[in-house]
Design a protein with these regions (language model features):
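Tryptophan-paired
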Residues: 1-51
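Short loop/turn segments immediately following beta-strands, especially the blade-tip
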Residues: 82-89, 229-237
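Short loop/turn segments that connect beta-strands within beta-propeller blades
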Residues: 84, 144-146, 188-193, 231-233
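Surface-exposed loop and turn segments in beta-propeller and other repeat-based domains
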Residues: 92-114, 239-252
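Repeated scaffold domains used in trafficking and secretory/extracellular systems
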Residues: 110-122, 156-165, 202-210, 248-259
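Short, solvent-exposed loop/turn segments at conserved positions within beta-propeller repeat blades
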Residues: 133-135, 175-183
Length: 267
């Protein structure tokens, strides 16, 4: 059944009637709901059900299994908290995972004092991994379950944001500075740390987000939103082709997230 318009369940639970009686469901039933972004979740029963005309059965509540954890970072720490457990008195009792960047000093080849100034921490690979960037010129990909550093580069000056791209490649937004690699969006391959495969100019680059539906990379910096498509992506020399630049009403763009396949949130 497809309703004539999407049903808004963000504020409260909603009852969705489905008319199928009379019917015998000898093996029970499964009800699957799909949201406007294509995420599906189900509720059901294995008990047999017989409905005569006019009868009804109410299923259990169907709840999305989308992650309700909040990830935030600053200084040398990354924290993951259960948003359902946190309250106005604090978050510490709700911490489910944390990472201290100084523990990766040897892997990064940096002094512990440079494993600091974290700017971005972004869950990727269905929440199994985490991309972390630092203004001290590095980016790392972590396995959340083990804390292992799966990829790192220290060639990303003033790295402010990163994003996973298809075929195990990573985009990094490198913000302002005097280095020739500042004010760029860089592309790396996970298997080849510290090797910049491609970079594109973007003044004060601060955010990168991949949209799987549109197959486009969105990047922000200064007063610009730049939209890239992938070019020669499976070759040894991939690149980002600038497709469009959108000037935003105000400058100083600092952060961006993908709300859904049709909506970006930019701050």
């Amino acid at each position: 059944m497809t309703p004539p318009s999407p049903i808004d369940c963000t504020g409260e639970a909603r009852l969705i009637p489905v008319m199928i009686a009379p019917v015998t469901l000898s093996q029970g039933y499964t009800v699957t709901l799909t949201d406007t972004d294509g995420h599906s979740f189900s509720v059901g029963s294995t008990d047999a059900v017989t409905l005569t005309a006019g009868d009804k059965i109410e299923t259990d509540d169907a709840r999305s299994t989308e992650v309700t954890e909040l990830i935030f970072c600053g200084d040398n720490m990354v924290y993951m908290i259960d948003a359902g457990l946190a309250d106005e008195t604090g978050y510490k009792n709700a911490v489910t995972w944390s990472w201290d960047a100084t523990t990766a000093a040897a892997t990064l080849g940096l002094a512990a004092s440079r494993c600091n100034h974290l700017d971005d921490c972004k869950p990727v690979d269905n929440g199994k991994k985490l991309l972390v960037t630092s203004s001290y010129n590095w980016c790392a990909l972590l396995d959340i379950a083990t804390g292992e550093v799966l990829f790192h580069t220290t060639a990303a000056p003033n790295a402010h944001s990163a994003e996973m791209l298809p075929d195990n490649r990573i985009a990094v937004a490198c913000s302002e500075g005097s280095n020739s690699d500042n004010n760029k969006v860089q592309v790396y391959d996970i298997a080849r740390p510290n090797l910049v495969l491609f970079q594109s100019e973007l003044g004060s680059a601060h955010g990168v987000v991949w949209n799987e539906t549109t197959q486009r990379l969105y990047a922000i910096g200064g007063q610009s939103l730049q939209i890239y498509k992938l070019k020669d992506w499976t070759s040894a020399t991939p690149s980002l082709e600038l497709e469009k630049t959108v000037q935003t009403p105000y400058g100083g763009l600092h952060d961006m997230s993908l709300v859904n396949s049709n909506t970006l949130c930019i701050g």
